[in-house]
C-alpha cells in the first residue's frame, strides 16, 4: 500500500501553488555541489533558525521527478535517522528562465561522514565509531525498506552528522528517479564505486532487476570507506570501475588490524549474488552491530572530535583548487563534490514544530519583515558596490604598477642602448684615432727610409762613378798591352805590388771574379744596362686577392733605378694561409727568375745585390707589374682601408685550360703567389695591407690561389675592369664597422712617367697568347646553355658579426618574429669588367642600382631562380666534383623578384657592386655570394636531395628560408626561359612576394631561450614553451613577449586541453605526469585573482614516475591518456564532474619490451588496442584481454632501432597505421600484416618526425626538412639547411607547424612554417 502512495498523491502537488521564499528564507552560503542541485545553508528570516535548502531548476521534463521527490520526502522523512523535510517553495524567475524549487530540510551542522574521515588523522575512523555509524545507517535503511523505498545512493557523502553526533540519511530515492535525467545529461549514474553489481548489471541489461539489498552492498563499501579513507577502486576511472565491479571478487579490508566481527560484517554486506545477501533485519542482528559498547560514550567522543575540528576550521581552510572547464556539454558552472557544512555557535537543529513557527504571528511581523528585507537588500547592495569598488581599485593599481614598471623598463632599455651606442661610438673613434696614428707612423717610417735610400743611392752613385772611371782606365791599359802577355789587373805605378793596391780595387777585382763564375755570359750586358741613364723611375705596385693598395710616390733613384720584373711561380705552390703575412714569403734569387725575365723583357736587369759591395741589407724584392686590357702598367686608387679579403680557387673553365693535357703555358701564372721580401722598400708601399688582409678561404675546393700579373684582352672594352687578378676575388663589405657601402674601384689616370710603358708597341709572346686564350674562353662561356640551379652548396663562411649586431640587423615585425624568407639574398653578377675571368661578384640587395643582365656570368629567370651557363662537358659531369673541388651544380636561394628597371632608375657601370646595411659573405663556389643569415635553402626537384656534407662553422643560427618549388613549377620556369633571357635590366631591390606566394614560408621568433626547448603547445593563439629550466608563454598576439610561468622545472612533453581547462605535462626531475590548471597559469600572468595564487595550481596523475611518453586520444566523448613507463603501459581516462580529473582505466605491467612511444586505437569503434614502439620494433596490446604481440620487427637492422612515430591512418577504422623508425617507415595493420608494398624512405636519419593534419608527415634532419605524403610516402617538398643543425618538432595547428633549433648548452629559437593549404598540390 505504501508503495503506491507516491504515485497516487502526485496530482495533489501543484508546483505553481507553492509560495515564494522571499521574506521567509534567505540563503547564507553554498555548502554542497551535488549532481542534482546545489545545497545551501539557509536561515529562517523571522527566527534565525538554520536549515538546509536544496535549490533545483524546474524544467518541464523534470517536473514529474520533482513531484515524486517532494512526495517521498513528505511521507518518509519522519525518522530519527533521516533528514527531516520541512517544506518547498518556488522562486519565480523572469520569462525565459526556469523557476527555482527550494526544498527546505533539516540542517546537519557537523557535515558528512566523508568530511569526518578527511578531518581524522590517518583518514581512518575508530572501529567503534564505524559500528555506531553503520548501526544508525541500518536503522534508517530499515525504515525505508519497510516502506518499499530503495535509497540507491548510500555513501559517505550522503550520511550527515548533526552537532550532537546524530546520523541522518539524505538524498534517498532521488538517484533512481533522476536516472533518465542523468542519462540525458551524459553524466555518470550516481556514484559507481558504491554501486552493487546487480545495479550495474541492470544498467547494462534492461531486463535485469534488483531490490533493496543493493543498499546493503553500498553500506559495506561505506564501511570500507570509513576504515581505509576511500572506497575500493577509487583511483580507477568511473567507467573502468563500472566494468570491474561485477567481474572482480568482492572487496575485503586490506589491513589485518580490524576485528573478526568487523571483517565478518564486511563479508556479509559484500556478497556478489544479491539473492544470497542477508536482509536488513538480519544485519541488524550481526554481532558487529548488536554488541556495541556504551552508545552514549561513542557519541560524546564523536561530538568532541567534531568540536575540535570546527575550531581548527574556524579560519578559512585551503581546499583543493577547484576549476571549471567546458566539457562541450550542458553542465553547471561550478564543479566538485559537496564540502563540509559549517555550523555557527549556538545553532540548533529545527524540530517538527518548524512549520508552526513559520506561520505564527504572520500578520504582526509582516511590516517588520519587509523592513528587514529592504535593509538587508540595501546592505547587500552596498557591500557588493564596495567589493566592486575595491576590486576595480585593485585592478587600477595593478595596471598603474605594471605601466610604471614597463615605463621604467623601457627607460632602462633606452638608457642601455644609448650607453651601448656611446661605447660603440667611443670605440670606433678610438680605433679611428689608432688607425690614423699607425698611418702617421707608417708615413714617417716611409719618409725616413726614403731619405735613407736617397743617401744610400747617392753613395752608390759616387762609388759606381769611381768604379766606372777605373774600369774605363783599365780598358785603355788592356788595349795597350800585348794580347798574349798577361798584365796586372790594376795599374797605378810600375812595379806596385798587389798588397799595395787600394782596398776598393781588391774588392772590385774579387767581385768581378765571382761574377764570372756565377754568370759568365752577362757582364757586357749588365754594363750596358747600368749605363742607360734614360730609364724612368717606377713606383711599386702590389696586389693581393684582387685588391690594390693606394698609390705611393715613385722612388727617386737617378743613377740606378730598380727595374720591374715579372715573376712566375709554380701553380702548385702552397696557398697563402691566414696565418702567414705576405712579407713572410721567401724571396727568390736571380737565377730562380732568369727564365721568366728572358721571356717577358727585352732587357736583362742586374740584381741589386751586385750593385752595392758594402750594403748589409737583404736583397731587394722583384717588382710585380700590373696589367690592364690596354696597358702594361695600371694603378687603381680610392680603395677604402680595412676590407677583409677572401681568395678562392680559379674557375673550372680556366682550370681545364691550364691542365697539362692542354699544353697551355698559362698554368704557371694561374695560382701563383705574391713574392715579398722583408726589405722595407716593398713593405712601405702598403701601410695598411697587413691589417686589411684578414684571411683566405677556399671553401670546399681543394686549392686556393692569389693573383699573379696577367694581361687582359681587348683594350677599353670593359671600362670597370679590375686588372691583375686571375682568380675569383670576392670582397666582403662589413657595413656595420665601416658605416658606408663599398664603392666600386675607379681606374686611376696614367701618370706621365708611365706613358712610355703604356704605349709600348709590342708585347711578349706568352702574354699575347694568354690574352687570346682568355678571349676564346669568354666566347665559349657566352655560348653556354642556361642551366637551372638545383643543387646546393653546403660550404659556408664564418660570420664575423656579433650576436648583438645580427639581432640589430634583423627586420623584426610587429609580432616579434623575423621573416626568415624575407631576409635579403645575394644574387650573382659578372665580375666588374672582367668577363674573361667569369668572377661572379655580389650585388647588395638593398641597393638602388641596376646592372645589365648581359654582364652576368649567369642570368636570372622571371621567377627569381638563378640560371648558370654550363658547358657540354659540365653537363656530363653534373652532380660530380671537378678536379679543383667544385661541385658540378651551383645552388642559390631564389628569392629576388626580377623585373625591368623602373622609369627614372639610373643604369650604372657594368661592374658596380653595391651593399647597403647588410653584411655579405662569400660562398665557396664560383664566387657566388650568399647571405650570412641563410639557413634554409629550397629545392625545386627532390631528386637532387643527396648533397655534399655541410661544413660545421660558427655562424649564428639566424635562419632564413626560401620558396620550395615542385617539378611542375620547374617546367613552368623552363617554359619562360626565353622570355627571361630577353630581360636587359634586372631590379635587385628585394620585394616581399610572400602575401601573393603559394609557397611555404618559415619565420622565427627573435627571442632566444637560454636552455634547450624540449616541447611546446598552443594555448589559444599563444605558445606555451617547455625547456630544460621551466615553462614559459610566448605571446604571439603581441610583440613576441615571453612570460616566465614556472622556473627550475624540466618540461619534457605537454598538451593543452582547453575544453578541460588543463595542461597535461611530463615534468620535473622524476618525470611525473602533472596536470596544470590553465586558470592558475593565466593568473600567473594577469595576477588579477589573489585567491587563485594561494592555491596549488597542479595535481599529479596517480603516482606515476619515470614517464617516458604519453598520448591523448579522443574517442567519441571520452579522452584517454595512454602513458609509457619504464616497463609498463598505463591507460587513464578523463572523468567529468564531479571528479574532473584523469583516473586510472587499465594497467599493463612487466612488458617484454620497454615502451618508448605509445598510441591508442579503437578498431572499428569497438576494440581498444595500445600500440607502442620499442628498441626492437612495434607491438600491440589488446586492452580487453591484455595479450601482447609484435606487429613489425625490422629484421634487416642489426641492433637497436629508434622509433619515431606511430600514425593511425585515416579512413581505416583504426586498423592500419604507418610506423616510422630510423630513416624508414612501413605500413602495417593492427595484426602485423604489411598493407602497402611501399617503404617510406627519408633522405637522411631524422631527429624528429611528426604527423600534420594536412595528411602529411614531416621529418627534421640535420641537412633538411622533408615533407611527405602519409598515404604514399612520396616526397612533397624539402627545405635544405645551409649547415648541419638539429631541429625538433614542437606542435602544429591548421597550416602552422612549430619547431625549434636544438643546441645543447646553447641558445634555442622557435620557428614556424606556414603551409599554404590551397597550394599544397601545386607546391
Curated annotation (Swiss-Prot):
Domain CNH residue range list: 1010-1297
The protein, known as: Traf2 and NCK-interacting protein kinase
Encoding gene per record: Tnik
Modification sites for Phosphoserine: 324, 326, 531, 541, 571, 579, 581, 611, 649, 651, 659, 672, 678, 691, 735, 737, 740, 922
SUPFAM superfamilies associated with the record: Protein kinase-like (PK-like)
Upper lineage: Eukaryota, Metazoa, Chordata, Craniata, Vertebrata
Species whose genome carries this gene: Mus musculus
Domain named Protein kinase: residues: 25-289
Disulfide bond residue pairs: none
Residue stretches of biased makeup (Low complexity): 691-726
Amino acid at each position: 500500500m505504501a508503495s503506491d502512495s507516491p504515485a497516487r498523491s502526485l496530482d495533489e502537488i501543484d508546483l505553481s501553488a507553492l509560495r515564494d521564499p522571499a521574506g521567509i528564507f534567505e540563503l547564507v552560503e553554498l555548502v554542497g555541489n551535488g549532481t542534482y542541485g546545489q545545497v545551501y545553508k539557509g536561515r529562517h528570516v523571522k527566527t534565525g533558525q538554520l536549515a538546509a535548502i536544496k535549490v533545483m531548476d524546474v524544467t518541464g521534463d523534470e517536473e514529474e521527478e520533482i513531484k515524486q521527490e517532494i512526495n517521498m520526502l513528505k511521507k518518509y522523512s519522519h525518522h530519527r535517522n533521516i533528514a527531516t523535510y520541512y517544506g518547498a517553495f518556488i522562486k519565480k524567475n523572469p520569462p525565459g528562465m526556469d523557476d527555482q524549487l527550494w526544498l527546505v530540510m533539516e540542517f546537519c551542522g557537523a557535515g558528512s561522514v566523508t568530511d569526518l574521515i578527511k578531518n581524522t588523522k590517518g583518514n581512518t575512523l575508530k572501529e567503534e565509531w564505524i559500528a555506531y555509524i553503520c548501526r544508525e545507517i541500518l536503522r534508517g535503511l530499515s525504515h525505508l525498506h519497510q516502506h518499499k523505498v530503495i535509497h540507491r545512493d548510500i555513501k559517505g557523502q550522503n550520511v550527515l552528522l548533526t552537532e550532537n553526533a546524530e546520523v541522518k540519511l539524505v538524498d534517498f530515492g532521488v538517484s533512481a528517479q533522476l536516472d533518465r535525467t542523468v542519462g540525458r545529461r551524459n553524466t555518470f549514474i550516481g556514484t559507481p564505486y558504491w554501486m552493487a553489481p546487480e545495479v550495474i548489471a541492470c544498467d547494462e541489461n534492461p531486463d535485469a532487476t534488483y531490490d533493496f539489498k543493493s543498499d546493503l552492498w553500498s553500506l559495506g563499501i561505506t564501511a570500507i570507506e570509513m576504515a581505509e579513507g576511500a572506497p575500493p577502486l577509487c583511483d580507477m576511472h568511473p567507467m573502468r570501475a563500472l566494468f570491474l565491479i561485477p567481474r572482480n571478487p568482492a572487496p575485503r579490508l586490506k589491513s589485518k588490524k580490524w576485528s573478526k566481527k568487523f571483517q565478518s560484517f564486511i563479508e556479509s554486506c559484500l556478497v556478489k549474488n544479491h539473492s544470497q545477501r542477508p536482509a536488513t533485519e538480519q544485519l541488524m542482528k550481526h554481532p558487529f552491530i548488536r554488541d556495541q559498547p556504551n552508545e552514549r560514550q561513542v557519541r560524546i567522543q564523536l561530538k568532541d572530535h567534531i568540536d575540535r575540528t570546527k575550531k581548527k576550521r574556524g579560519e578559512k581552510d585551503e581546499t583543493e583548487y577547484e576549476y571549471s572547464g567546458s566539457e562541450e556539454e550542458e553542465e553547471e558552472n561550478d564543479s566538485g563534490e559537496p564540502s563540509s557544512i559549517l555550523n555557527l555557535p549556538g545553532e540548533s537543529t529545527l524540530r517538527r514544530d518548524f512549520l508552526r513557527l513559520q506561520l505564527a504571528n504572520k500578520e504582526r511581523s509582516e511590516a517588520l519583515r519587509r523592513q528587514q528585507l529592504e535593509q538587508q537588500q540595501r546592505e547587500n547592495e552596498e557591500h557588493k558596490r564596495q567589493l566592486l569598488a575595491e576590486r576595480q581599485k585593485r585592478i587600477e593599481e595593478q595596471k598603474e604598477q605594471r605601466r610604471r614598471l614597463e615605463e621604467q623598463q623601457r627607460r632602462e632599455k633606452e638608457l642601455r642602448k644609448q650607453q651601448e651606442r656611446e661605447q660603440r661610438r667611443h670605440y670606433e673613434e678610438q680605433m679611428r684615432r689608432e688607425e690614423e696614428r699607425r698611418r702617421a707612423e707608417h708615413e714617417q717610417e716611409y719618409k725616413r727610409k726614403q731619405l735613407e735610400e736617397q743617401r744610400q743611392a747617392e753613395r752608390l752613385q759616387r762609388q759606381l762613378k769611381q768604379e766606372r772611371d777605373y774600369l774605363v782606365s783599365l780598358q785603355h791599359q788592356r788595349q795597350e798591352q800585348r794580347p798574349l802577355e798577361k798584365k796586372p789587373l790594376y795599374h797605378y805605378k810600375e812595379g806596385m805590388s798587389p798588397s799595395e793596391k787600394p782596398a776598393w780595387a781588391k774588392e772590385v777585382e774579387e767581385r768581378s771574379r765571382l761574377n764570372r763564375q756565377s754568370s759568365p755570359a752577362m757582364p757586357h750586358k749588365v754594363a750596358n744596362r747600368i749605363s742607360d741613364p734614360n730609364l724612368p723611375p717606377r713606383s711599386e705596385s702590389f696586389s693581393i686577392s684582387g685588391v690594390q693598395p693606394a698609390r705611393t710616390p715613385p722612388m727617386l733613384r737617378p743613377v740606378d733605378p730598380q727595374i720591374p720584373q715579372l715573376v712566375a711561380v709554380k701553380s702548385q705552390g702552397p696557398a697563402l694561409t691566414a696565418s702567414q703575412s705576405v712579407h713572410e714569403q721567401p724571396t727568390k734569387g736571380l737565377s730562380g727568375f732568369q727564365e721568366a725575365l728572358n721571356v717577358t723583357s727585352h732587357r736583362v736587369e742586374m740584381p741589386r745585390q751586385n750593385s752595392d759591395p758594402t750594403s748589409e741589407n737583404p736583397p731587394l724584392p722583384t717588382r710585380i707589374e700590373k696589367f690592364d686590357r690596354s696597358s702594361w702598367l695600371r694603378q687603381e686608387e680610392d680603395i677604402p682601408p680595412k676590407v677583409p679579403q677572401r681568395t678562392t680557387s680559379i674557375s673550372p673553365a680556366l682550370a681545364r685550360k691550364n691542365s697539362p693535357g692542354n699544353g697551355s703555358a698559362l698554368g704557371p701564372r694561374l695560382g701563383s703567389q705574391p713574392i715579398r721580401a722583408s726589405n722595407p722598400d716593398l713593405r712601405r708601399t702598403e701601410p695598411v695591407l697587413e691589417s686589411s688582409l684578414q684571411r683566405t678561404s677556399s671553401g670546399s675546393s681543394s686549392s686556393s690561389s692569389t693573383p699573379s700579373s696577367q694581361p687582359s684582352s681587348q683594350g677599353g672594352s670593359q671600362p670597370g675592369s679590375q686588372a691583375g687578378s686571375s682568380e675569383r676575388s670576392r670582397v666582403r663589405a662589413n657595413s656595420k664597422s665601416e658605416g658606408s657601402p663599398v664603392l666600386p674601384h675607379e681606374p686611376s689616370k696614367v701618370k706621365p712617367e708611365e706613358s712610355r710603358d703604356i704605349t709600348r708597341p709590342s708585347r711578349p709572346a706568352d702574354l699575347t697568347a694568354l690574352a687570346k686564350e682568355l678571349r676564346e674562353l669568354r666566347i665559349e662561356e657566352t655560348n653556354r646553355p642556361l642551366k637551372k640551379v638545383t643543387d646546393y652548396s653546403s660550404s659556408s663562411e664564418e660570420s664575423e658579426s656579433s650576436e648583438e649586431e645580427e639581432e640589430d640587423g634583423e627586420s623584426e615585425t610587429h609580432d616579434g618574429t623575423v621573416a626568415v624568407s624575407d631576409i635579403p639574398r645575394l644574387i650573382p653578377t659578372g665580375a666588374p669588367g672582367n668577363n674573361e675571368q667569369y668572377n661572379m661578384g655580389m650585388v647588395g640587395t638593398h641597393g638602388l642600382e641596376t646592372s645589365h643582365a648581359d654582364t652576368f656570368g649567369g642570368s636570372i629567370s622571371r621567377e627569381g631562380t638563378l640560371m648558370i651557363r654550363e658547358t657540354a662537358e659540365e653537363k656530363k659531369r653534373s652532380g660530380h666534383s671537378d678536379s679543383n673541388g667544385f661541385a658540378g651544380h651551383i645552388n642559390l636561394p631564389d628569392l629576388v623578384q626580377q623585373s625591368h628597371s623602373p622609369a627614372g632608375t639610373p643604369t650604372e657601370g657594368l661592374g658596380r657592386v653595391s651593399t647597403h646595411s647588410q653584411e655579405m659573405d662569400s660562398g665557396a663556389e664560383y664566387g657566388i655570394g650568399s647571405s650570412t643569415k641563410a639557413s634554409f635553402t629550397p629545392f625545386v626537384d627532390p631528386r637532387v636531395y643527396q648533397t655534399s656534407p655541410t661544413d660545421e662553422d660558427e655562424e649564428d643560427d639566424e635562419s632564413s628560408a626560401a620558396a620550395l618549388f615542385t617539378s611542375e613549377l620547374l617546367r613552368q620556369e623552363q617554359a619562360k626561359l626565353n622570355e627571361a633571357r630577353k630581360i636587359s635590366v634586372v631590379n635587385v631591390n628585394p620585394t616581399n612576394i610572400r602575401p601573393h606566394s603559394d609557397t611555404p614560408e618559415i619565420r622565427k621568433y627573435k627571442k632566444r631561450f637560454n636552455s634547450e626547448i624540449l616541447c611546446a603547445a598552443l594555448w589559444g593563439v599563444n605558445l606555451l614553451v617547455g625547456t630544460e629550466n621551466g615553462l614559459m608563454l610566448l605571446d604571439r598576439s603581441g610583440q613576441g613577449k615571453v612570460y616566465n610561468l614556472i622556473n627550475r622545472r624540466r618540461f619534457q612533453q605537454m598538451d593543452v586541453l582547453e575544453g578541460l581547462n588543463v595542461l597535461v605535462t611530463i615534468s620535473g626531475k622524476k618525470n611525473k605526469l602533472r596536470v596544470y590548471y590553465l586558470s592558475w597559469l593565466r593568473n600567473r600572468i594577469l595576477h588579477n585573482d589573489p585567491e587563485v595564487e594561494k592555491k596549488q595550481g597542479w595535481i599529479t596523475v596517480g603516482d606515476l614516475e619515470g614517464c617516458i611518453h604519453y598520448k591523448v586520444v579522443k574517442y567519441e566523448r571520452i579522452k584517454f591518456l595512454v602513458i609509457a613507463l619504464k616497463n609498463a603501459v598505463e591507460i587513464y581516462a578523463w572523468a567529468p564532474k564531479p571528479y574532473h580529473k584523469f583516473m586510472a582505466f587499465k594497467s599493463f605491467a612487466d612488458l617484454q619490451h620497454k615502451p618508448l612511444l605509445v598510441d591508442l586505437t579503437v578498431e572499428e569503434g569497438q576494440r581498444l588496442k595500445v600500440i607502442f614502439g620499442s628498441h626492437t620494433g612495434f607491438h600491440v596490446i589488446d586492452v580487453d584481454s591484455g595479450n601482447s604481440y609484435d606487429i613489425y620487427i625490422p629484421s634487416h637492422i642489426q641492433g637497436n632501432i629508434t622509433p619515431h612515430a606511430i600514425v593511425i591512418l585515416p579512413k581505416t577504422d583504426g586498423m592500419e597505421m604507418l610506423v616510422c623508425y630510423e630513416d624508414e617507415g612501413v605500413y602495417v595493420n593492427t595484426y602485423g600484416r604489411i598493407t602497402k608494398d611501399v617503404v617510406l624512405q627519408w633522405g637522411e636519419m631524422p631527429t624528429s618526425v611528426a604527423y600534420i593534419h594536412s595528411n602529411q608527415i614531416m621529418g627534421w634532419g640535420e641537412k633538411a626538412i622533408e615533407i611527405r605524403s602519409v598515404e604514399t610516402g612520396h616526397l612533397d617538398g624539402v627545405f635544405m639547411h645551409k649547415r648541419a643543425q638539429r631541429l625538433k618538432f614542437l606542435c602544429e595547428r591548421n597550416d602552422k607547424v612549430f619547431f625549434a633549433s636544438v643546441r645543447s648548452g646553447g641558445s634555442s629559437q622557435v620557428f614556424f612554417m606556414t603551409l599554404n593549404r590551397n597550394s599544397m598540390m601545386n607546391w
